[in-house]
Amino acid sequence: RDRHYIAYPKENVIKTWSEIKHAEKKPVTLWRYASTMLYFSGNEYYLTEFSSDWAKEAQMSTQPLLFGKKVIDTKLGSRAAMHTHPFFELGFEQPAQEAQGRAMLGTIGWTGNFQFTFEVDNVGNLRVIPAINPYASDYELKPNEVFTTPEFIFTFSNNGTGEASRNLHAWARNYQLKDGQGDRMTLLNNWENTYFKFNEELLAELMKEAKHLGVDMFLLDDGWFGNKHPRNSDNAGLGDWEVMRSKLPGGIPALVQSAKEAGVKFGIWIEPEMVNPKSELFEKHPDWAIQLPNRKTYYYRNQLVLDLSNPKVQDFVYLSL
């Protein structure tokens, strides 16, 4: 096993990962494979973690790390960060604070199931172990094949989490984000302003206000589609991607023209992988929605997921877009 480090002195950031290989005659199964292990000697450690849900993003909580193990993990797969963030803060001798005190910030470069383990031993030393979650993640490694773990990125600060977060911001702009140093487009989304209740005149006025604020793009959100089953609430219309004539008689071209006159770009929200049972699409093709036989159908926000493995569904989504 080889452990690798790359230091970014200007940003005060370190990136580390592990490579695992073997020379056995037959494949070896990997059951656990951490990106690294960091070891600290101190008197007190405080962990700050973040949890989320709809309308409850980034709920912060802090707790002391005492003897034993504390684990932050997720098993949600492609939705790994939905409830648990792959990010943490550590405070040394005191809870992590914005503008003072020793702090460490860390994150893992992995979009799937992850696991952070924090273990305080019997003499008060702390081990931090970031890794792919070992749950259902065994990997058969062939002889002389190299298995590379996700990268773990972390930074330290003697001046609180504010300085530490700016370290990571600078590192991301310089080394991680595409065009990180360039100007980034800003947009105004109408959702929190109007929800489903809008018309062409109101949207045109919002576009003018967006320009006045210095915003680059106006994004039209949910509620612009559906005729037989108008999308005036989240109960109907998903899947019927035709402009609602009663709400937007001029259609999308009229809105694009209003955006041009206001001097902003125009964007639009669409969720082509979802469908409401109360929609023309579902009435015509109920078999296109994913449902389990002999099970009561479960609805989340009154909608179902379309079966994108079905070529007919793929064609429908492509043509809709």
Question: What is each PLM-predicted segment?
Answer:
Residues 179-320:
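Aromatic-lined carbohydrate-binding/catalytic grooves of carbohydrate-active enzymes
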Residues 139-158:
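Short Pro-Gly-centered flexible turn/kink motifs
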Residues 154-185, 192:
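Terminal connector regions
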